UniProtKB/Swiss-Prot annotation:
Pfam families: AMP-binding, PP-binding
Annotated transmembrane regions: none
Catalytic activity: holo-[peptidyl-carrier protein] + L-proline + ATP = L-prolyl-[peptidyl-carrier protein] + AMP + diphosphate
Region (Adenylation), start-end ranges: 20-417
Source species: Aspergillus aculeatus (strain ATCC 16872 / CBS 172.66 / WB 5094)
Listed name of the protein: Nonribosomal peptide synthetase aneB
Function, in words: Nonribosomal peptide synthetase; part of the gene cluster that mediates the biosynthesis of aculenes, a unique type of norsesquiterpenes that contain a nordaucane skeleton linked to an L-proline moiety and are of mixed biosynthetic origin. The pathway begins with the synthesis of dauca-4,7-diene by the terpene cyclase aneC using farnesyl pyrophosphate (FPP) as substrate.
Domain Carrier: 559-635
């Protein structure tokens, strides 16, 4: 590598506030900050920061004094940064959410003069100050109280002076702070601006945590280049990023790939440029974003202002590991073993960087500086020798022919988790200290970042146990000691103690006891062998280390002991898609990933084998060992009860004879009486989606557009559809109105198979128009080469059955037989309520004492127009913690509704799958079983989130045997029940059923005609297949949006409460709002 092809970029000798001041002069009235708590022009930001700089000078902030900034994400952060710079001080960020002990250590390590804070963080700032520091200063009070001091001389600060300190994780147990000068920061910003598509038109999202050096780069990119810094509210930033981007009209943002993967590119039309960085980029990231935005990349540690290399355009590279060329530094590749030797050209080695944007070293840490920085190494040409240090990145890379860098990983124990750089040594230091309190001396500890059995990258701590034999077997199986009875309690204690010193992302998820730590030939800890041996453990051994204390204990020795337990183990494994050895007799259902829908599948499988078990049984008895004590076993196969045609409506129609009913139905359908095979009364599903359209114009029609494989035979597909229709009586149902003794009633008529596929039809349907009418088929299917379009009324399907219809269609297309589908057993089960006085009593008691207040309030003149809605999207992440996903969602929604409407007694319409009904084969039958039923969540504000979620889970289990009721029957039970039935909130928690669709039909899109619901608020949570995350859809009627305020933050509040349930479940409900700052 020659000097000509590895030049050092020129230094730009300016201060941060000097460059900012030029933007003030050039465009004073342009937007500088657009934040949730206010906007500032460049002139206003200049004035406020000058006022604060004057105040800080009077408090002794000048000549390099260190000032800690402790803020929420708000406009005041920009004011504070610029003010400290103008005053001549040096600032550094504190992340208020981190442990106070860690923040205090940071302040002491740099001998901070004072803490400058927002009003909301004054209590944290007070805990950090000591006798050596000035009293904390609240920025809002200081700026609003003081007079404008007038112009200040900005030339007193030299560009060579320090501007800020960037803290990163340190291997000695404390964070280390890299000192960055004004000219280093300015040089990095200005040299890297063009390749990152940055200019004064940029509206930049301030997203990064203050623990991440990108947070202050986001400020620089906007304020030094004349753009606008866009700062969302804290809850929106964390939980509703898509809404934040659109509401602030963000067109440029930096994200880690992990965060970017949570977003939906089509939902961000304002976004022009996305820059990825902080962790490795994958080809999947490129595939996801390149069709929608200009995608660039930024690579580099905090020790290099604004990074080392920029990938200007990912659409032009062959590998996602190509991080681009350097723009603000010169790069050298040295030997991985010896930094005094250059690596051969084109070889992989450690990356060393040289140039004006490199930090000055670590503040008050000369030993760490010496290890990480080089001064005039022998391979550096004499012409380049200076007092400026070179930085050893610890990253392995090689230089391509075009000057780009190809990233090859790390050479040390520094890792990144979710974009956050951590030193494993810092975790080891604090873990040793915590374990030392329990042992005679601190044991050896090794922390590793690993992906184990599909878990996300996480930190695991291995520690050597004293007093055990350290002789290891050949394959290392005996290296790891199995968990004992106190394992879970110790793990939770260690984690609790570490939270006083480390942020959450650095807390180990498990602490693995080992007989001894493997060593290399040179006597160092053999980390590679340790990782490999652990990953090779049997699955039941590994899972035993990740118990979360959810009401049971996973036993590595607890294999089934009886024939029934072994039979149940096979059923659990098949249902949860686990290996037999992964399911022990003492493993709790939920700890294995079991949820309510999976429980329904288990019930169906068990019935086929003669085991009578219910969904409540599974959740209440938790483990195979206890469950098998409460189930009954019957000999012989399960039989399906049959019902003669027309028998299910005769009791409703009184003295009207069968033939009279057939003739009435046939006349409305335009068929002969012989074509009417049966008549069914409405179930709860049909009652909810057929009767309302006559009065409010919601037709509940789904449009499913399928992209068919080019080679598919349309004639064969049409024949297959005829077979499916013939086998499935549900698809042949039509709505008819029949005479009763004193009135008319609407029922469903099952007709002969006369619903063929048709050529692709032109669709010209106005919103709110009834597409079907009495006596007409309720499904239409049109086909053309490469495309199938289905229109189907909700009376014929639910979220579970639709995929099963296409499963049957694929089987018929391939010449396989299609099982006949009878709806009568389910209809009979749902109509048994006529004589169920004890069941009706359950519903009376459920709503006893309800005061009639529904939320949002019911719209009096509910017509088609007022049902137009606003649509918002969000996302959730879940962790195994002993709570069902459904109850987390339900309680979180109830909590947020209680904040908006000042009531803890919430009624809503829940969509219930009802696949736990005692009907053979119900899980695999393509019949519409679900129902919208009124439900009630009574929050106890004095109790913890945990107690409220536990109560909700029990309420759901108690309700399951009573789900067969129809909404009209609830209305007649009591005045309170009638009032609750006027609910205006709908909640649907839906499993991702995409895997049910055969491959030939999997490429499809769904949509609805007209308004989706007649209710004011509808929330749908679409769970991922592993139930570890969910996409959230929130629809609000226009009338509700107009009459009620603060809906823009509703979804963010909801997501924050779900997080709180998982992270801090002991918080009382009545203290949660203050805790979240909502």
């Amino acid at each position: 590598m020659t000097l000509d092809d590895n030049p050092v970029p020129p230094t730009l000798p300016y201060t941060l506030h000097g460059v900012f001041q030029q933007n003030v002069l050039d465009r004073p009235d342009a937007s500088a900050v657009c934040a949730w708590d206010g906007d500032l022009t460049y002139r206003e930001l200049d004035e406020k920061s000058s006022t604060l700089a004057h105040i800080l000078r009077h408090r002794g902030v000048q000549d390099g004094a260190l000032v800690a900034l402790c803020f929420d994400h708000s406009l005041w952060t920009a004011v504070a940064m610029m003010a400290v710079s103008k005053a001549g001080g040096v600032w550094f960020f504190l992340e208020p959410k981190h442990p106070v002990n860690r923040l205090r250590q940071m302040c002491r390590s740099v001998q901070a003069r004072m803490v400058l804070c927002s009003r909301s963080q004054a209590s944290v700032a007070a805990e950090l100050s000591d006798d050596q520091m000035e009293a904390p200063l609240s920025i809002e009070e200081a700026v609003l109280r003081e007079e404008d001091p007038g112009p200040m001389d900005l030339e007193v600060v030299s560009p060579e002076r320090p501007a800020y300190v960037a803290f990163t994780s340190g291997s000695t147990g404390s964070p280390k702070g890299a000192v960055m000068t004004h000219q280093a920061a300015v040089t990095g910003v200005l040299h890297n601006a063009k390749p990152m598509q940055l200019d004064r038109t940029a509206r930049i999202l301030q997203f990064a945590s203050f623990a991440f050096d990108i947070s202050f780069l986001e400020h620089f990119w906007a304020l030094l280049l004349g753009g606008c810094l866009c700062i969302p509210a804290p809850l929106d930033r964390q939980n509703n990023t898509i809404h934040a981007v659109q509401s602030l009209q963000v067109n440029w943002m930096f994200l880690t790939p992990t965060v970017a993967r949570l977003l939906e590119p089509p939902q961000l039309p304002s976004l022009r440029t996305l820059v990825l960085g902080g962790e490795p980029v994958t080809q999947a990231d490129l595939d996801m974003w390149l069709p929608y935005v200009h995608l660039a990349g930024l690579y580099g540690p905090a020790e290099c202002a604004v990074g080392i290399a920029v990938q200007p355009d990912y659409s032009r590279v062959e590998s996602a590991n190509n991080v681009g060329p350097p723009f603000s530094v010169a790069c050298w590749i040295v030997s991985e073993q010896d930094p005094t030797q250059l690596a051969p050209r084109g070889a992989v080695g450690e990356l060393v960087v040289e140039g004006p944007s490199i930090s000055e070293g670590y503040i008050n840490a000369p030993e760490q500086t010496t290890r990480a920085y080089l001064t005039n190494p022998t391979w550096l040409p004499a012409a380049r020798h200076s007092t400026k240090k070179l930085y050893r990145t610890g990253d392995l890379a090689r230089v391509l022919d075009d000057g780009s860098l190809l990233f090859h990983g790390r050479k040390d124990t520094q890792v990144k988790i979710n974009g956050q750089r951590i030193e494993l040594g810092e975790i080891e230091y604090h873990t040793r200290a915590v374990l030392g309190k329990e042992h005679l001396r601190s044991p050896p500890v090794v922390a590793e970042a690993m992906e184990v059995r599909g878990r996300a990258l996480t930190v695991i701590a291995f520690y050597q146990v004293e007093g055990v034999c350290q002789d290891l077997d050949h394959d290392g199986q005996d290296l790891f000691l199995p968990p004992d009875d106190g394992f879970v309690g110790r793990k939770q204690s260690y984690q609790s103690q570490l939270r006083d010193h480390l942020p959450e992302y650095m807390i180990p998820t498990s602490f693995i006891p080992v007989r001894g730590l493997p060593l290399t030939m040179s006597g160092k800890t053999d980390r590679k062998t340790l990782r490999e041996k652990f990953a090779q453990l049997p699955s039941d051994r590994i899972k035993a280390y990740f118990v979360d204390g959810d009401g049971g204990s996973r036993s590595t020795e607890g294999m089934p002991t009886t024939p029934l337990e072994r039979q149940m183990q096979e059923l659990w494994a098949a249902t949860l898609k686990l290996e037999l050895e992964e399911v022990g007799r003492n493993d709790p259902w939920m700890s294995l990933g079991g949820e309510s829908l999976a429980a329904m599948r288990l019930v169906a499988r068990a019935r086929k084998e003669g085991i009578a078990v219910t969904v409540p049984d599974i959740f209440r008895h938790k483990t195979i060992a206890t469950l098998c004590q409460h189930v009954s076993v019957r000999p012989g196969p399960e039989t399906i009860e049959s019902f003669p045609p027309f028998s299910l409506v005769q009791c409703q129609q009184g003295s009207t004879g069968i033939e009279e009913l057939r003739h009435a139905a046939a006349q409305q359908c335009g068929l002969t009486p012989e074509a009417i095979e049966d008549l069914y009364p409405f179930t709860a599903m049909q009652e909810a989606v057929v009767i309302p359209p006559a009065t409010i114009g919601v037709n509940y029609t789904l449009r499913l557009d399928v992209k068919l494989p080019a080679e598919l035979d349309l004639e064969q597909l049409m024949r297959a559809w005829d077979m499916v229709v013939a086998a499935n009586s549900v698809l042949r149902m039509r709505v008819v109105r029949l005479p009763a003794d004193e009135s008319e009633t609407m029922v469903l008529a099952v007709t002969r198979p006369e619903i063929p596929m048709e050529p692709l039809f032109a669709e010209r349907f106005a919103p709110g128009v009834d597409l079907w009418g009495l006596g007409k088929p309720l499904v239409r299917v049109g086909v053309a080469p490469g495309r199938l379009v289905m229109l189907i009324q909700h009376a014929l399907y639910d979220g579970h059955s639709l995929g099963l219809i296409f499963r049957d269609l694929e089987q018929a297309y391939r010449g396989q037989p299609v099982a006949a589908v009878s709806y009568s057993p389910f209809v009979h089960w749902s109509t048994e309520w006529q004589d169920g006085s004890n069941k009706q009593q359950y519903w009376r008691e459920k709503f006893a004492g309800f005061d009639g207040r529904v939320c949002p309030p019911r719209v009096a003149d509910a017509g088609i127009g007022c049902m137009e809605s606003q649509h918002f999207w969000g996302s959730l992440n879940f962790r195994p913690d002993g709570f069902t996903v459904t109850s987390k969602i339900r309680v979180a929604l109830a909590v947020v509704l209680s904040w908006h409407f000042d009531t803890c007694d919430i009624v809503l319409g829940g969509i219930y799958a009802r696949r736990g009904a005692p009907i053979p084969g119900i899980m695999e039958s393509p019949v519409p079983a679900s129902a919208i039923l009124p439900d009630r969540i009574r929050l106890d504000p004095t109790q913890s989130l945990r107690a409220n979620v536990d109560q909700d889970q029990e309420n759901i289990l108690t309700m399951m045997p009573y789900e067969g009721i129809r909404p009209s029957q609830v209305l007649d039970l009591s005045e309170a029940a009638r009032a609750a039935s006027q609910f205006q909130t709908i909640l649907a928690v839906q499993q991702d059923n995409s895997s049910v669709y055969p491959e030939m039909f999997r490429d499809h899109e769904m949509g609805y005609y007209g308004p989706v619901t007649a209710h004011n608020l509808m929330m749908q949570c679409f769970l991922s297949p592993d139930r570890a995350s969910a996409r959230v859809s929130l629809r609000l009627s226009e009338r509700t949006m107009q009459e009620t305020t603060a809906w823009d933050r509703f979804l963010a509040h909801f997501e924050a409460v779900v997080d709180a349930i998982q992270e801090k479940p002991e918080i009382p409900v009545d203290r949660l709002r203050q805790h979240l700052g909502a």
